[in-house]
Amino acid sequence: VMNLWPGVRLRVTEGWDEDGHHSEESLHYEGRAVDITTSDRDRNKYAMLARLAVEAGF
């Protein structure tokens, strides 16, 4: 993220869910999922952000 979009930071908005906000099969209940966005919340970056996550092994 730093190299691709200088000044933009990665934001983790949720990592663990115990309140039932996700589907029953969600990995959030096991602590194995995260919801992420960028600091500028530019939705046009989301596809590339997903690609970067996959390339990083997530």
UniProtKB/Swiss-Prot annotation:
Homology family = Belongs to the hedgehog family.
User: Which BP terms in the Gene Ontology apply to this protein?
Assistant: cell fate specification; cell-cell signaling; proteolysis; regulation of gene expression; smoothened signaling pathway
- One GO MF term: patched binding
Q: Which residues cross the membrane?
A: none
Q: What is this protein called?
A: Indian hedgehog protein
- PTM remark: The C-terminal domain displays an autoproteolysis activity and a cholesterol transferase activity. Both activities result in the cleavage of the full-length protein and covalent attachment of a cholesterol moiety to the C-terminal of the newly generated N-terminal fragment (N-product). The N-product is the active species in both local and long-range signaling, whereas the C-product has no signaling activity.
Task: Provide the primary localization.
Answer: membrane
Q: What is known of its domains?
A: The indian hedgehog protein N-product binds calcium and zinc ions; this stabilizes the protein fold and is essential for protein-protein interactions mediated by this domain.
What gene does this protein come from?
ihh
Q: Identify the GO cellular component terms for this protein.
A: extracellular space; plasma membrane
Q: Which UniProt keywords apply?
A: Autocatalytic cleavage, Calcium, Cell membrane, Developmental protein, Hydrolase, Lipoprotein, Membrane, Metal-binding, Palmitate, Protease, Secreted, Zinc
Residues where Zn(2+) binds: 28, 35
Instruction: Return the InterPro entries for the record.
Output: Hedgehog, Hedgehog_sig/DD-Pept_Zn-bd_sf, Hedgehog_Signaling, Hedgehog_signalling_dom
Q: Which Gene3D superfamilies match?
A: 3.30.1380.10
List ligand-binding residues for Ca(2+) 1. 13-14
